[in-house]
Amino acid sequence: MSEIHGSVITDDGVRLAYKTVGDGPRNLLLLHGWGGSANSWNAFIRSLDLRKFRAVALDIRGHGDSDKVTTGFTDERFARDALAVADAANARKFISVGFSMSGRFVQYLPLLSPERVEGVVIIAGAPASAMELPEQVITDWAARAGDREKLREVPIMFAVNPDPTLLDEYADDAAKASRYALGATLRMLLTSFEERIKGRSPAIPTLVLAGKADSLLGPDVQKAIAANYPGSRVVELDCGHELLVEKPGEAARHVAEFVGTLPS
């Protein structure tokens, strides 16, 4: 199945790169994790039945082939960016899927356009509540910008059995991310919008995937996230945090099964 690459200019003037793969009736809007890009989803996408799904994967601002800017690093702006990509890709409705830091951003999307979000999938996601991240960690990780080998070390810290080829692909793309973006996205996790999502009605169908051995955002964190979404389901996989380089096929299978339960 061929990839179609495109870009869109947001209403604040930032060019975002994205790609679509597949021509199925269900749109999956895919948001990558820290340092990643649309390519972070390649192994996941290869595991999907693309007669049933259409993957729309974007490079978050400051990452991949998107503009390297120093503005717009807020949860609302990132959600609006994702909607701009969905518009450009003609994905009127979609299931939003976010990995790691983007597990937080996909939680913001229903606050802006609940009628467009058919379901939410949070994969080892960051919570909508404020996290505690030492400034030294933020500084150290951001300082790795442009250094492929040092960036490759980060997912290894939190993975149990990563695929070396997928790690290499991650590192190639992570080297494109700007230093500002690498730091700013981490600082976004220090804020909270949890009160805005608690008790929202109607509830949007939600699936949460957790790595049993995730030392960063493990099962307890994922269960706390799920508690904000009545009727949500938590599935634990035998891996660490880095599901997209450890268990992409299994993650794709669970997402496909979840989407199969949604109204058509």
Regions found by a protein language model. Give the residues of each.
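Conserved acidic catalytic loop of the alpha/beta-hydrolase fold
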Residues: 77-94
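Short beta-strand/loop motif that positions the catalytic acidic residue
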Residues: 202, 208-210
